[in-house]
């Protein structure tokens, strides 16, 4: 009998896992044993002679796969944040194993008959609101995943799901390996003219760590790539970096083009097998947007304002570049560089001026102080919690009255084995165990921030501070839920609602009241100067049209892939992509491919859902207006958001939750108003 105790240790706070006692080589065996245990328990539920009730069916089923959930949550946490080649190989085996198990349960006619019986009698069962939502979610989970199909179609669905379970981790791994394979080695410091000293120091230390003597090493990790593209005067070097970044997993040994064609084809087949015309139709049925027509109309509305603003932004940058010695047509590797120079000229502001005021620890403390002031929750470092890497810090999260809310694991810097980007993960949702005890959430926030150097602490860019607040907002959604059922607690909400708490948090970062809480010079302790905040605020809508237009184009690309009703015509990924975004191409096409590294939609759960970021931006812009109207830290407004949005998870439809908070629907113009894109 396998001992699963390391995944939930009795002697640790909140039964946290002990990563030090979990051996990489045991995952496969542990998952097989956990699946066997779960199967036996599901058989007991299935073969019960008792009339179905919520307790003996829904609750009983929720408790069948406890060990499997524990092992998988740890495995997938590490697969993203602390992976190895062996784990990537395991993922190719684990995906089909868990897919087969899920389908064995989801397609079992006897199990579904019990769920269906409860659904038919739902109004006579005396269920409370939460139980009704859980029953509905369970019934839809079965029906939307093939429970009503005939045997032959069920077999076909199994084949599709097995293949998809292999392809998504393969796509993600290819993107990671392709990015990691690139290095730009510079041996002449004169070639780095324009680059800030802190970026050069970091590149020097990276080179030393990689045994490149007397050199500077630049990679495609964001803390290296973005400063390089923003400040390096050498246009040829910028071009090299841009071409590498824009060609991740494209026409190299980690190429993702075949994976994309397979994923898209299988998603179409799956949707049509389940009675939908397209994958987007299938996905959007369970979203606030409801259908593609609504998404299309939403994007068209944004496009109407973003397009002319983007053209204006491009014209302004082009004129400025020509005025200052640039000759010719701007290329993609020129935009960030010249836009930064134009911002400096127009606002006398360089975001690098902010960096000394954003040492990482102060920013962490600031995010925590912000949450305490806004929502009445306190985060405190806690010792003795085993972590999966020395970079990871743990915090206990409590209400001000001492009520425990959960544990937060924070992991901030790039390293080999960690994928790019930033994300919030869940090691355990808030839930109720088989003994009826509430289990509190274990949540992680994982990022790839600028590293400390030998001489300075990690000093963040403003974008990185926004990312910290964003991911912490997701974490608060998980930690502050009051729902004791994992299926509807925390971030278990519609995908186009889940970004509201995270994006809302970013709004405070241009407010003096918030910045003065934590933005202090790492050497002198001086609070960030008022003049610098004013410059930040004055420049916050700089290039907003360009940025929004870019986001709309990515949404259109996502929808182009997922509104197909046949994959027969997709012979060439890049040709399909070019056609899909041709109307959004304002700069000359210079090669590369977005789709091959677009992990959000091919490996990250945002297929037919990338629009969710913009959809939620309308919500967060409107929600923040409630705080500007009532006071940035108005206790009543903060508590109302906590109790109507964060606490309730997916226990009610998101539109209902938002109306309860705001007293009305979100104003569709709120995003354009905030970004300065509404016509006067």
Annotate the PLM regions:
Residues 2-23, 29, 33, 215-217, ...:
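C-terminal, non-catalytic "cap/extension" segments appended to globular domains
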Residues 450-468:
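Short pre-active-site segment immediately N-terminal to the catalytic Zn-binding motif
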Residues 1-195, 627:
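N-terminal helix-rich structural modules
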